[in-house]
């Protein structure tokens, strides 16, 4: 009995050591504390990381997020995985996407946000509590920011802005704009949502996200909207330069 108990104890100690080692490896790679591996995708190799405790990172701790409620995470993960499996491993690698950090109530400089991309660490932080109405689209919106930041030369914002009517002007920054609504316009006039009108990169990300979720509806709208049609063609051409096999 003694030997049996000792073997069990050694196994438990080993598992604890392995878990701690994994946590240290994750921190060394992406510099976010209190994470654990939630799942490694067999489809495209994404490492999904769960937050065991609240964390604070960035300049002066300006990025904060809370630990995940496990029941909430279990429910949201079904949606998250379904959407991210639309991207193959080769495409993700080309766009510096490897780690998805899952947490609740994500803030940057006291502003709530759905996601924070970091191509240097190949990491995307996702707020699993983001508004359910827009949640799936937000996932692709944030993926686009990873894509654009990885290939800025293919997403010329001056060229993009030239598609708009001459009198239109974007805001100076997304956070200094009151153009925040995410609902799809009935009459697009070059923009799918009010948020699209904030800055060029958000405009691109909004179109990309809608194409990933509801391509047919957006293409139908573009048939009556030349500006939107040009923007869609621009995104498709840019993506083809990154990965010719990519399809919406």
Q: Which residues does each predicted region cover?
A:
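Positively charged n-region of N-terminal signal peptides that target proteins for export
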Residues: 1-9
């Amino acid at each position: 009995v003694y030997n049996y108990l000792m073997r069990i104890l050694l196994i438990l100690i080993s598992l604890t050591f392995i878990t701690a080692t994994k946590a240290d490896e994750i921190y060394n790679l992406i510099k976010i504390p209190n994470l654990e591996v939630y799942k490694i995708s067999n489809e495209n190799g994404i490492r999904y990381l769960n937050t065991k405790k609240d964390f604070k990172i960035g300049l002066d701790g300006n990025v904060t997020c809370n630990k995940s409620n496990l029941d909430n995470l279990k429910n949201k993960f079904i949606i998250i995985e379904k959407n991210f499996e639309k991207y193959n491993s080769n495409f993700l690698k080309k766009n510096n996407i490897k780690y998805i950090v899952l947490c609740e109530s994500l803030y940057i400089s006291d502003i709530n946000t759905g996601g924070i991309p970091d191509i240097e660490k190949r990491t995307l932080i996702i707020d699993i509590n983001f508004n359910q109405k827009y949640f799936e689209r937000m996932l692709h919106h944030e993926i686009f920011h990873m894509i654009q930041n990885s290939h800025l030369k293919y997403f010329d914002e001056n060229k993009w802005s030239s598609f708009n009517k001459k009198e239109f002007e974007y805001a100076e920054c997304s956070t200094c704009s009151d153009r925040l609504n995410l609902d799809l316009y009935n009459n697009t006039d070059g923009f799918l949502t009010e948020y699209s009108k904030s800055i060029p990169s958000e405009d691109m990300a909004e179109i990309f996200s809608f194409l990933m979720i509801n391509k047919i509806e957006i293409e139908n709208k573009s048939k009556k909207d030349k500006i939107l049609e040009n923007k869609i063609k621009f995104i498709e051409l840019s993506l083809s330069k990154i990965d010719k096999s990519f399809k919406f």
